């Protein structure tokens, strides 16, 4: 899947959870959605894209930071 599409998707998810929530709560909810709903391949690609992608909004960026922190060890082991 193209990086731009994944970035757009995670931004949309973050926007949804960010409406009416604190940024940290919204980032956690975004992360949980991604872990529940995205295929392993999509999560691995998002980890490779990383939180430095300039297209990420603040909540999405934090969610990707959390994703990298939680998914990176399984990437190495798998």
Q: Predicted regions span which residues?
A:
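Intrinsically disordered, low-complexity, basic-enriched segments
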Residues: 1-32, 36-78
């Amino acid at each position: 899947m193209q990086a731009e599409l994944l970035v757009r998707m995670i931004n949309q998810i973050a926007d949804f959870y960010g409406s009416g929530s604190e940024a940290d709560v919204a980032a956690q909810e975004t992360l949980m959605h991604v872990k529940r709903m995205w295929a392993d391949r999509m999560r691995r690609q998002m980890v490779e894209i990383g939180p430095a992608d300039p297209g990420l909004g603040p909540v999405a960026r934090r969610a990707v930071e959390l994703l990298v922190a939680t998914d990176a060890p399984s990437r190495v082991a798998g």
